[in-house]
């Protein structure tokens, strides 16, 4: 069964020149990139995207980071796309939990600026796709 996921290539990855490498890894994995947009995240979309973290100590810094420069938003499709991308991404903390061979394990330096975001469930994917690509929202 084909599944969709939202991926963000975060501002730190864009600034460090890793967009091509990350997209290449996605394509080599066999996932289809069905939507792609380079943009600076508007504050309202960023706040809605990270709403589950509101009130936590790191939330203001997270919003500042994600809106602080260009990022790439993408929709990926493929069998088990959510799990497949999360495997490519590696653990959230690039130094403590991400293994070499993953995006974060190979290029990540710190937990907050960890290069990429990938949806963690079908429900999250559909909610996030609707935020970043409203015209692709599931009916």
UniProtKB/Swiss-Prot annotation:
GO terms for cellular component: cytoplasm. Its cofactor is Mg(2+). InterPro entries: NDK-like_dom, NDK-like_dom_sf, Nucleoside_diP_kinase, Nucleoside_diP_kinase_AS. CDD domains: NDPk_I. The active site is at residue 117. It is found in: Cytoplasm. Transmembrane segments: none annotated. The keyword Phosphoprotein applies. Its EC number is 2.7.4.6. GO terms for biological process: CTP biosynthetic process; GTP biosynthetic process; UTP biosynthetic process. Major role in the synthesis of nucleoside triphosphates other than ATP. The ATP gamma phosphate is transferred to the NDP beta phosphate via a ping-pong mechanism, using a phosphorylated active-site intermediate. Homotetramer. This is Nucleoside diphosphate kinase.
């Amino acid at each position: 069964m084909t599944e969709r996921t939202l991926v963000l290539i975060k501002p730190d990855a864009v600034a460090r020149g890793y967009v091509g490498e990350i997209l290449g890894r996605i394509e080599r994995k066999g996932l289809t990139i069905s939507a792609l947009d380079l943009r600076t995240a508007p504050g309202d979309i960023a706040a809605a995207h990270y709403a589950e973290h509101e009130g936590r100590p790191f939330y203001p810094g997270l919003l500042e980071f994600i809106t602080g420069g260009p990022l790439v938003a993408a929709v990926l499709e493929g069998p088990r796309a959510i799990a497949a991308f999360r495997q490519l991404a590696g653990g959230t903390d690039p130094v403590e939990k991400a293994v070499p061979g993953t995006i974060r394990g190979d290029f990540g330096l710190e937990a907050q600026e960890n290069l990429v975001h990938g949806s963690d469930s079908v429900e999250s994917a559909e909610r996030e796709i609707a935020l970043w690509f409203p015209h692709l929202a599931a009916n």
